C-alpha cells in the first residue's frame, strides 16, 4: 500500500510539473514580443562642420597712372629723328666776344655765364667755343666734316652717315635751338673724348645741373641720342629738370619718355 501511495504521489508531481511547463510554453508562445530584440536606436546624424567659405582676397588698389607733363620750349627735342620746329625763334645774347663771338638764348645766357665764372673760380679754364648756329653755319660744318672724311679715305657714299654721328645734319642740331653750348678746357683745346679727363669737364659734369644744364650726350648713349659721346656739349633744360635728369642718370630722350606727352 505504501508503494502505491508513493507512485501516485510521484505521478501527481510529474503531472504538476507538466502542467507548469505547458503553462509556461503557452505563455511564451502567446507573448512573442517579449523575446523580440529591441530595435537599435537610430544613430544621431553627425553634424558636419560647415566648410568655411574662402576669404576673398582684397582687390589691389591700382597704382595711379602718373600724370604726364606738358612740354615747354626749354624741353624741345632736336635730334636725328626730330628736326628743329619750322617756326622756331630765339632771342640771343652774347656770351663770348672772342673772334666772331658766341651767342646763346637769353633765357639761359646768365646761367651759362655764372656757371663759367664759378668753374673758373674753382681753378679751371673753361671756354665757350660754340653756341647758337644758323642753318648756314651748321650746313658748312656738316659739309666740312664729310670732306675731311672723304679726304681720309672714307667712301663718299658712306661719308654723310658717318659725319652725322659727330656733326648733326642741318636742321637736327641743338645748337640751332640756341640752348646748347660747347665748352672746352683751354689746356686741352680739342673736341674729343680726351676732354673728359680735364679738370674743367670734371667740374662741369658734377655741377652743371645746378645751373640748369645737362651733359647732353653721355658716354654709352649714342644709340639713344643718335650722337657720339661729347664730353663738352651742354644743354639748358631749366633748374628743376636738370636736377631730375642728373639724379636719374638718364638722357633727355629717356627723361621725356618717362614724364611727358609723346611728340605728335
Write out the residue ranges for each language-model feature.
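Extracytoplasmic cell-surface/polysaccharide-interacting catalytic and binding patches
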Residues: 2-264
Amino acid at each position: 500500500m505504501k508503494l502505491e501511495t508513493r507512485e501516485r504521489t510521484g505521478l501527481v508531481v510529474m503531472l504538476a510539473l507538466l502542467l507548469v511547463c505547458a503553462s509556461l510554453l503557452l505563455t511564451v508562445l502567446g507573448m512573442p514580443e517579449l523575446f523580440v530584440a529591441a530595435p537599435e536606436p537610430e544613430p544621431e546624424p553627425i553634424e558636419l562642420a560647415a566648410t568655411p567659405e574662402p576669404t576673398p582676397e582684397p582687390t589691389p588698389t591700382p597704382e595711379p597712372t602718373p600724370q604726364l607733363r606738358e612740354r615747354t620750349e626749354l624741353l624741345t627735342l632736336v635730334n636725328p629723328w626730330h628736326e628743329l620746329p619750322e617756326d622756331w625763334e630765339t632771342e640771343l645774347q652774347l656770351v663770348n666776344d672772342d673772334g666772331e663771338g658766341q651767342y646763346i638764348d637769353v633765357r639761359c645766357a646768365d646761367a651759362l655765364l655764372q656757371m663759367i665764372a664759378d668753374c673758373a673760380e674753382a681753378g679751371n679754364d673753361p671756354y665757350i667755343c660754340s653756341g647758337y648756329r644758323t642753318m648756314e653755319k651748321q650746313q658748312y660744318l656738316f659739309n666740312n666734316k664729310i670732306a675731311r672724311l672723304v679726304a681720309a679715305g672714307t667712301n663718299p657714299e658712306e661719308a654723310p652717315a658717318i659725319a652725322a654721328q659727330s656733326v648733326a645734319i642741318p636742321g637736327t642740331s641743338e645748337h640751332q635751338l640756341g640752348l646748347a653750348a660747347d665748352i672746352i678746357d683751354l689746356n686741352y683745346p680739342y673736341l674729343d673724348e680726351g676732354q673728359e679727363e680735364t679738370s674743367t669737364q670734371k667740374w662741369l659734369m658734377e655741377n652743371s645741373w645746378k645751373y640748369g644744364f645737362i651733359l647732353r650726350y653721355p658716354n654709352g648713349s649714342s644709340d639713344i641720342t643718335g650722337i657720339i659721346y661729347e664730353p663738352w656739349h651742354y644743354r639748358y633744360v631749366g633748374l628743376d629738370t636738370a636736377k631730375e635728369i642728373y639724379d636719374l642718370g638718364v638722357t633727355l630722350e629717356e627723361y621725356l619718355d618717362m614724364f611727358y606727352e609723346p611728340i605728335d
